Each structure stands twice: as structure tokens, then as C-alpha cells.
Amino acid sequence: MPGLVIEREVLIEAPAEVVWRTITEPDQISQWFADRVDLVVEPGAHGYMQFGDQGGLVVVETVERPRRLSFRWNYPAGEEPVTGNSMLVEFTLTPEGDERTHLRVTESGHELRDWPGEERQRYADEHREGWAEYLDRLSSVLADRRPG
């Protein structure tokens, strides 16, 4: 059985600055991740992300342009995301030359939720599958923008 901490990595055919904009600008985020994004990416900022008919609050924790971004998110909407009731998502971008970026996404916090163990594992598994799909979408969105 996979653990409760999710780690996904992908090599993206785009410069780090382009990847950064795509993971931090609301109109870009909605092309590969959440359906609706109301968020300013600065430390301590509060926002909201909508996925289909579900959404949740978001609190930005770390912003180190263009290398690192982290935020806490929670659902159901209404609860303030804090340690213990939310997941921490961390994006780490590492340039691979001028035209490629290694992106690592880590999501933790499932182990701290007060859900029964089976439910906690189910959510972690769903998020693990979700991140694989979202990173595929991100890569596709950026590949479609490449000239030629």
C-alpha cells in the first residue's frame, strides 16, 4: 500500500520561468489544474480553488520565484487550512538547461487529518492519481505552446 505522502516528478520541455507562471497565475492554473482559481501568490495570501462541484480554501506559505511554491489547501470549504486539517503542497522547480525544467510536487498532511485510516488512505490514493493526471495536463499545455 502506498504511503500517505505523495511525490510526483516530471521533466517539462519549458524554461523554469514559463513553468513558474503556469503554476502561479490563476488564468494559467485553470488550464491544467483547478477549474476556478481565486488566488494571489504571495506568502500568507488566502484564496480558493474549485474542482468541479467541490472547492476549498488555500493559504500560500512559501514563494521563492521561480524555484519554490507551497500552499495549504483544505476541503470541505469553510475550514481555515492549518497544520492538522489540510494538505501541504510543495512545488520545486529545477532548471535543466535553458529549455527544460524538472518539477517535483509533494503533497503531505493526509496523515494528520482526523479521518479514519481507510478514508485517509483513500484520499491519499485519489490525490496521487490526481497529481499524475494534473502533471500530464501541465506538460501537455506547455508542449502545445512550444513553437514549431
What are these regions, as identified by a protein language model?
Residues 139-148:
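Short, highly charged C-terminal tails/helix-capping segments
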Residues 7-8, 27-59:
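Short beta-edge strand/loop motif at the mouth of beta-sheet-based domains
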Residues 8-10, 57-62, 86-95:
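Hydrophobic/aromatic beta-strand elements that line small-molecule binding cavities or substrate pockets
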Residues 19, 29, 47, 60, ...:
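Hydrophobic pocket/interface hotspot
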